[in-house]
């Protein structure tokens, strides 16, 4: 009997076939200013403690499925309010996916602003939810009236709001976010991935809004390689979401090392303070360059737009050829036309980036 040819296209959902996989560019040997990581290494003595701890960790055993010790450390370090529960994820991405899967009834809508964190849209597709993106104002401020109108029209099951926003870096007006939370018929998740670099939070609002959840990650604070995200909220929400969390999703090495680093949170906060100082200096120096518009930021990155004499894609490629990797956002959304995003690195990395960028801009002007 002849065997019929088999194709995954016959089985896999068409909306998945239409997706492109999330691309992470190779960065070996480059100045890496594209992924919003903390660039500072840990002090040698702390690295030695972690190496010893890793060596003593029983990796042949499954981790604590509840990560009780780590949760206790996080509750204290992040000032989680009394009465609120915590759920941990393998990075924030897993938490976003759990929420979407839990709320993804047939025809349900997941809403966010645009431009926003790309995983909101992608995970809505993964979970068979309809995605609605509401454009920001041209200055990247929140269009609260448009959001409220979209809420009334689409009745979203889930709304994600990043605070500060990625990729724009700005903090939206807190009063307007509260209006959105009050108007939402479903759950509102405030994503505070960049909280370490901002001076605002909705953590103390959790008790005041029955439909509010708050998400954090330790990636930007210096633990990107550990992949650890956190969701805080009322127990009645988290009890349901826990049903979708896969067993042992936070590995034993991640649990042990994260606990150790939280005991030395002062080191991480000092590094965050250094990044904020560099951010101010870098924003100022970028703004001094001819042909660049720099946008306000409360994150560990800076969004800037090149004027019409320069092409963002060309500048991105030339920076890359010179060993500097930033994020090219031109084409990602109409509001991001000719925009690049640069992570705040260490002082010498930032200086090299600025020097090369200035050289490239001058070269283009000379040709004009």
From Swiss-Prot:
<comment type="pathway">
    <text>Amino-acid biosynthesis; L-histidine biosynthesis; L-histidine from 5-phospho-alpha-D-ribose 1-diphosphate: step 7/9.</text>
</comment>
<keyword id="KW-0663">Pyridoxal phosphate</keyword>
<dbReference type="InterPro" id="IPR015422">
    <property type="entry name" value="PyrdxlP-dep_Trfase_small"/>
</dbReference>
<dbReference type="GO" id="GO:0000105">
    <property type="term" value="P:L-histidine biosynthetic process"/>
</dbReference>
<dbReference type="InterPro" id="IPR015421">
    <property type="entry name" value="PyrdxlP-dep_Trfase_major"/>
</dbReference>
<dbReference type="InterPro" id="IPR004839">
    <property type="entry name" value="Aminotransferase_I/II_large"/>
</dbReference>
<dbReference type="GO" id="GO:0030170">
    <property type="term" value="F:pyridoxal phosphate binding"/>
</dbReference>
<keyword id="KW-0368">Histidine biosynthesis</keyword>
<keyword id="KW-0032">Aminotransferase</keyword>
<comment type="subunit">
    <text>Homodimer.</text>
</comment>
<comment type="similarity">
    <text>Belongs to the class-II pyridoxal-phosphate-dependent aminotransferase family. Histidinol-phosphate aminotransferase subfamily.</text>
</comment>
<keyword id="KW-0808">Transferase</keyword>
<feature type="modified residue" description="N6-(pyridoxal phosphate)lysine">
    <location>
        <position position="220"/>
    </location>
</feature>
<dbReference type="InterPro" id="IPR005861">
    <property type="entry name" value="HisP_aminotrans"/>
</dbReference>
<dbReference type="Pfam" id="PF00155">
    <property type="entry name" value="Aminotran_1_2"/>
</dbReference>
<keyword id="KW-0028">Amino-acid biosynthesis</keyword>
<dbReference type="GO" id="GO:0004400">
    <property type="term" value="F:histidinol-phosphate transaminase activity"/>
</dbReference>
<protein>
    <recommendedName>
        <fullName>Histidinol-phosphate aminotransferase 1</fullName>
        <ecNumber>2.6.1.9</ecNumber>
    </recommendedName>
</protein>
<dbReference type="InterPro" id="IPR015424">
    <property type="entry name" value="PyrdxlP-dep_Trfase"/>
</dbReference>
